[in-house]
């Protein structure tokens, strides 16, 4: 579900690094890394799953409103998750606007996506059809 990078605090990053670093002194490195990193990764996953689940639900509602059915829904669901990951990673502002504009251009040319629906998806995720959240 939540694929890619999600925002993490310094303490979360340090906890995961420390779990990996301490494992390298053990001969069974792989199993030690997995057992040490597992709680940190699980906590990060549990923190971020609700965000991305709500994105899927909100985008699904928009797609139903526009009458998009079948496999075409996957195009817009994928776009919505990319926008949500970008918002989660880089926050709002000009960088997000540039990323959204690039993604929209790509989805329009590669998947023949409807620009109005893409704008509605951006609006439901960011609160603004342009992606700029002040």
Curated annotation (Swiss-Prot):
Does the record carry Nucleotide-binding as a key word? Answer: no
Pfam families in the record:
Sulf_coat_C
Q: Where in the cell is it found?
A: Virion
Keyword check for Transmembrane helix: no
**UniProt cross-references to InterPro entries, sorted A to Z:** Sulfobus_virus_coat_C (IPR022014)
Give GO cellular component annotations, separated by semicolons: helical viral capsid
Molecular function terms from GO? DNA binding
Q: State the UniProt keywords alphabetically.
A: DNA-binding, Virion
Q: What does this protein do?
A: Self-assembles to form a helical, filamentous nucleocapsid. The capsid proteins wrap around the DNA and maintain it in an A-form by non-specific desolvation and specific coordination of the DNA phosphate groups by positively charged residues. This certainly protects the viral DNA under conditions such as the extreme desiccation of its host.
Subunit structure, briefly?
Answer: Homodimer.
Q: What is this protein called?
A: Major capsid protein
What does UniProt list as this organism's lineage?
Viruses, Adnaviria, Zilligvirae, Taleaviricota, Tokiviricetes
């Amino acid at each position: 579900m939540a694929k890619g990078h999600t925002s993490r605090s310094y303490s979360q990053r340090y906890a995961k690094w420390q779990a990996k670093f301490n494992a390298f002194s053990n001969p069974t490195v792989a199993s030690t890394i997995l057992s040490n990193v597992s709680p940190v990764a699980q906590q990060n996953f549990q923190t971020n799953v609700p965000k991305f689940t709500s994105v899927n639900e909100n985008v699904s509602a928009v797609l139903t409103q526009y009458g998009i059915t079948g496999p075409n829904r996957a195009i817009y669901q994928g776009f919505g998750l990319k926008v949500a990951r970008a918002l989660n990673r880089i926050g709002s502002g000009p960088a997000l606007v540039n990323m959204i504009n690039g993604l929209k251009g790509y989805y329009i040319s590669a998947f023949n996506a409807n620009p109005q629906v893409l704008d509605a998806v951006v609006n439901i995720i960011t609160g603004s059809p342009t992606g700029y959240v002040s």
